[in-house]
């Protein structure tokens, strides 16, 4: 069975795409359909909500970071034995980076590649008939990206709905949803985006409220009729990040949460065993594992507890003496000597690398990254080219004396310089690895 699919797009972030996407996913799941979510680009938070809403794994589909073969393989995997795939756009529908055609990282790339229709979510607060001009611009901007319908979001009244909706339908686009303003439907955010799905005490209740909204305010049958088959060309996993070991000790708790779903899924698919442990519960990596991986997350919110986790710290030092450890972003921060939290208090970290970081001295670092490894590490062999994404506010306050791990370029190929560190069996970077670049 091959799924039918539709892209949920918008002019910008904050238009309501995520709430509409989750509402549709949860509502269709409650109807007994097999539905999966996907997210364009490198945002690793939204797939967690997609998974919670459906009970089936979400995935990122990133046309810049993933070579076409891997992109097709992951898209086909989402479509297999599934009724519908709802693909949520990052940012605005056409937003990406200047790159080769089809490799910009935008959701529009996926619409062209797979011939998928777009359901356009318009935040019409502060406007009415002007929304039709916006919709017409989207409908005519790129003839290879087809707008199939519109959802009006944040309406103030029935009159507001009629003015906006009639103008849009007059240009030939069906309006399949009209959502009144309701701040209680908003998902809470913090500095790296939405608060993660696993942090909600009443997550399912909120997802069901979004599903109730979708049932009430959207014509879900019409949305399903707009979807078209998702049938990617043949793909493969040669460019996936290979398992760094047969048994992988993976830090997994409220401080360590940012691991791309497709990365862990492929490790398992390739035969590796993932053995989770919780640094916040003062657990050490299992000594029987071959490698330890500290993913990103929010260690700055738990720095005091991590600093006091003596079993964790001793176990990591013991592991590092003979086996590889790699940290990404938040994990990289914990591998260093010290971490200053937002209040200015400094906490001792693992000291397996010599750098120190601060969350009190904040500056956003954001963008695609391409890294050529200077040495063998859990990311790959020396000389390997890895594509990923960097998004953090922490700043380096001390660099230490460790060797650089990689030479970094931004998404446009502009050199950024040496990045990350390595010492003995330990390595770390601020960027999150997504895939290997094609040879």
UniProtKB/Swiss-Prot annotation:
- An annotated GO BP: cobalamin biosynthetic process
Please write the reaction equations for the catalytic activity of this protein.
Answer: hydrogenobyrinate + 2 L-glutamine + 2 ATP + 2 H2O = hydrogenobyrinate a,c-diamide + 2 L-glutamate + 2 ADP + 2 phosphate + 2 H(+)
User: Which PANTHER family does UniProt cross-reference here?
Assistant: COBYRINATE A,C-DIAMIDE SYNTHASE
Entry keyword annotation includes Nucleotidyltransferase: no
Q: How is this protein named in the record?
A: Hydrogenobyrinate a,c-diamide synthase
Residues at the site labelled Increases nucleophilicity of active site Cys: 432
So which cofactors does this thing need?
Mg(2+)
Q: Where is the GATase cobBQ-type domain?
A: 247-439
Per the UniProt record, which residue ranges are transmembrane? none
| Active site location | 329
Gene behind this chain? Answer: cobB
User: In which family does this protein belong, per the annotation?
Assistant: Belongs to the CobB/CbiA family.
Q: What's the EC number here? A: 6.3.5.9
What keywords does the record list, in alphabetical order?
ATP-binding, Cobalamin biosynthesis, Glutamine amidotransferase, Ligase, Magnesium, Nucleotide-binding
Miscellaneous field: The a and c carboxylates of hydrogenobyrinate are activated for nucleophilic attack via formation of a phosphorylated intermediate by ATP. CobB catalyzes first the amidation of the c-carboxylate, and then that of the a-carboxylate.
Cysteines engaged in disulfide bonds, as pairs: none
